[in-house]
């Protein structure tokens, strides 16, 4: 039995979001639909989820005392991390004091950087991964590149969405990869992971939801990235039954080890029927935005249901679907969007604008979504819809 109170009253059921970007915004909307009181926290004002929350707080979530002060004042029923850059050691303490962290404080800690989750997957669970080394200094990094071999992928251990990520194709380009990882990662300079190249046919995100009734899987999501950042995704991605079964077993193993309830974005490489673990996020995944149109329960609805202990009897796929990012480039503190009617002229299309208040450089500002008779048609419709939305600075 789940009991939900009334927002802004003494009986309110409260979710506190740590991170208030576009993914957090959709979580907030789903929570609001169930009468949950939402508090949004982020490091900058007017973040997307703040625009649909009951209250907001602007603070560095790496500032442990400030984070604790907000949580003790708000007394949320659930603390829901939506990004990696959080004072996770403080979350572990708060969880021990009785504040539920989604899915668990340990999961947030292990996945806040690539080292924790890679060591769990490869060294504790014995999952197949790419070869890897960690490095703290330029000298250790160059030695790691030699050990793993060229070409190799270089990533800050604490970063996401491709920030600070590059490919070192030889010893000459390795120096530039080190410098880029030190300056472009979300958490500044620090430790990096050097990964050997994986020979794969394709990569997928397998959305895996742990809920009161067990573990469920969404249809596999294919995606394309540029410079490590998501640009388009589609669902379902075709794969053999053997590969799908192995992917689900691997996703089930790693999410069980992390524990708790909620949705996990498990990233996997597929080569024939072989499956190789890449990463996992204990929260909604950016490539999963396609589920806003592809499924009866989006990844955000699944996350909120799981958090609240509500049933998830089935996850129904409406049909082949795709998403295409709407990008802004330049500098603005009040971007606008010119939407040509052609953007939504086709049936089974939609656009979502995130409401991000500022643009500096290249930033994801929205997404176009489409259903089709097959994935290729859905992708073409999503691409066309996105092309008819122009960002004005």
Swiss-Prot record:
N(1)-(5-phospho-beta-D-ribosyl)glycinamide binds at residues 22-23, 82, 286, 356, 363-364. It is an enzyme of class 6 (ligase). It catalyses: N(1)-(5-phospho-beta-D-ribosyl)glycinamide + formate + ATP = N(2)-formyl-N(1)-(5-phospho-beta-D-ribosyl)glycinamide + ADP + phosphate + H(+). It comes from the Bacteria. InterPro entries: ATP-grasp, ATP-grasp_carboxylate-amine, ATP_grasp_subdomain_1, PreATP-grasp_dom_sf, PurT, PurT/PurK_preATP-grasp, PurT_C. Pathway: Purine metabolism; IMP biosynthesis via de novo pathway; N(2)-formyl-N(1)-(5-phospho-D-ribosyl)glycinamide from N(1)-(5-phospho-D-ribosyl)glycinamide (formate route): step 1/1. The keyword Nucleotide-binding applies. Keywords: ATP-binding, Ligase, Magnesium, Metal-binding, Nucleotide-binding, Purine biosynthesis. PROSITE patterns: ATP_GRASP. GO terms for biological process: 'de novo' IMP biosynthetic process. Its EC number is 6.3.1.21. GO terms for cellular component: cytosol. ATP binds at residues 114, 155, 160-165, 195-198, 203. GO terms for molecular function: ATP binding; magnesium ion binding; phosphoribosylglycinamide formyltransferase 2 activity; phosphoribosylglycinamide formyltransferase activity. Mg(2+) binds at residues 267, 279. Residues 119-308 form the ATP-grasp domain. Belongs to the PurK/PurT family. Involved in the de novo purine biosynthesis. Catalyzes the transfer of formate to 5-phospho-ribosyl-glycinamide (GAR), producing 5-phospho-ribosyl-N-formylglycinamide (FGAR). Formate is provided by PurU via hydrolysis of 10-formyl-tetrahydrofolate. Homodimer. This is Formate-dependent phosphoribosylglycinamide formyltransferase. It comes from Solidesulfovibrio magneticus (strain ATCC 700980 / DSM 13731 / RS-1). The lineage of its organism: Bacteria, Pseudomonadati, Thermodesulfobacteriota, Desulfovibrionia, Desulfovibrionales. The gene is purT.
């Amino acid at each position: 039995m789940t009991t939900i109170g009334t927002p802004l009253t003494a009986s309110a059921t409260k979710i506190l979001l740590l991170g208030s970007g576009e993914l957090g915004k959709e979580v907030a909307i789903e929570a609001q639909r169930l009468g949950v009181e939402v508090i949004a926290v982020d490091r900058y004002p007017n973040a997307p989820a703040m625009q649909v929350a009951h209250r907001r707080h602007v603070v560095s979530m790496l500032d442990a005392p400030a984070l604790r002060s907000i949580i003790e004042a708000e007394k949320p029923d659930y603390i829901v991390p939506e990004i990696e850059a959080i004072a996770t050691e403080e979350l572990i303490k708060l969880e021990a004091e009785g504040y539920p962290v989604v899915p668990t404080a340990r999961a947030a800690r292990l996945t806040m950087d690539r080292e924790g989750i890679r060591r769990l997957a490869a060294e504790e669970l014995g999952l197949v991964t790419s070869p890897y080394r960690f490095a703290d200094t330029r000298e250790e990094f160059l030695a790691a590149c030699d050990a793993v071999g060229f070409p190799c992928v270089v990533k800050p251990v604490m970063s996401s969405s491709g920030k600070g990520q590059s490919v070192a194709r030889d010893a000459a380009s390795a120096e530039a990869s080190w410098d880029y990882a030190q300056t472009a990662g979300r958490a500044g300079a620090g430790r990096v992971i050097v990964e050997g190249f994986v020979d794969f046919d394709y990569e997928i995100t397998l959305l895996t939801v742990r809920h009161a009734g067990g573990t469920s899987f969404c249809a596999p999501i294919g995606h394309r990235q540029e410079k490590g950042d998501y640009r388009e995704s589609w669902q379902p991605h075709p794969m053999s039954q053997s590969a799908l079964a192995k992917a689900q077993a691997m996703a089930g193993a790693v999410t069980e080890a992390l524990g708790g309830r909620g949705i996990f974005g498990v990233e996997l490489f597929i080569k024939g029927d072989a499956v190789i673990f890449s990463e996992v996020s204990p929260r909604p995944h950016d490539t999963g935005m396609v589920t806003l149109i592809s499924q009866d329960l989006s990844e955000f609805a699944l996350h909120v249901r799981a958090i609240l202990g509500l049933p998830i009897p089935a996850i129904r796929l409406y049909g082949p679907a795709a998403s295409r990012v709407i990008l802004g480039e330049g500098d603005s503190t009040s971007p606008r969007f010119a939407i040509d009617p052609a953007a939504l002229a086709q049936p089974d299309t939609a656009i979502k604008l995130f409401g991000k208040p500022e643009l500096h450089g290249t930033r994801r500002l929205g997404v176009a979504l489409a259903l089709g008779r097959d994935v290729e048609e859905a992708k073409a419709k999503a691409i066309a819809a996105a092309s008819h939305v122009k960002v004005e600075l």
